Every structure is written in structure tokens, then in C-alpha cells.
Amino acid sequence: MAHSVKVYDTCIGCTQCVRACPCDVLEMVPWDGCKAGQIASAPRTEDCIGCKRCETACPTDFLSVRVYLGAETTRSMGLAY
């Protein structure tokens, strides 16, 4: 499946998304842009199964982590016409 995972700079470095991911797609990397000094990164997007647990776990009002499902998955869900 070709899913993409985007981490936005609204990330607060809480690690909730990393802990929620069952496929170890996300990891934390150093970043000076937040108090925690780290930000989520998605170096293994090819392993993403599109479960969106990382999105659900994100505590920010604007989801800092978003999963964009590939066309094949969207079509099988009946969302694309």
C-alpha cells in the first residue's frame, strides 16, 4: 500500500504517535522548534498500514501527524468514485 505520513511543525514532541503506531513507522528526532526538543519523523512510510492510530493519539488541536491513504485503499473503502 502506498500511504504517506506527514508530520507538521505543530508537533509538541509528546511521543504519543510513536507509541501508538503498531508498525514502527514513526520515530522521534531532535528539533529546536518545541519545548520538548524533538519532533516525530516518519522514515519508514512503506511500512504504514493506514490504521491512523497515530492521528487518533495526537493531542494537538491541529493533528500534527496525518496519514494520507493511497488510492487503492481509498477505493476499497468506497470513498472514491
UniProtKB/Swiss-Prot annotation:
It is a peripheral membrane protein. The keyword Nucleus does not apply. Its EC number is 1.97.1.12. One of its GO terms (biological process) is photosynthetic electron transport in photosystem I. It catalyses: reduced [plastocyanin] + hnu + oxidized [2Fe-2S]-[ferredoxin] = oxidized [plastocyanin] + reduced [2Fe-2S]-[ferredoxin]. One of its GO terms (molecular function) is electron transfer activity. It is an enzyme of class 1 (oxidoreductase). Its cofactor is [4Fe-4S] cluster. [4Fe-4S] cluster 2 binds at C21, C48, C51, C54. It holds the Pfam family Fer4_7. Residues 2-31, 39-68 form the 4Fe-4S ferredoxin-type domain. It is found in: Plastid, Chloroplast thylakoid membrane. [4Fe-4S] cluster 1 binds at C11, C14, C17, C58. One of its GO terms (cellular component) is chloroplast thylakoid membrane. Keywords: 4Fe-4S, Chloroplast, Electron transport, Iron, Iron-sulfur, Membrane, Metal-binding, Oxidoreductase, Photosynthesis, Photosystem I, Plastid, Repeat, Thylakoid, Transport. Binds 2 [4Fe-4S] clusters. Cluster 2 is most probably the spectroscopically characterized electron acceptor FA and cluster 1 is most probably FB. HAMAP family: PSI_PsaC. Apoprotein for the two 4Fe-4S centers FA and FB of photosystem I (PSI); essential for photochemical activity. FB is the terminal electron acceptor of PSI, donating electrons to ferredoxin. The C-terminus interacts with PsaA/B/D and helps assemble the protein into the PSI complex. Required for binding of PsaD and PsaE to PSI. PSI is a plastocyanin/cytochrome c6-ferredoxin oxidoreductase, converting photonic excitation into a charge separation, which transfers an electron from the donor P700 chlorophyll pair to the spectroscopically characterized acceptors A0, A1, FX, FA and FB in turn. The eukaryotic PSI reaction center is composed of at least 11 subunits. This is Photosystem I iron-sulfur center.
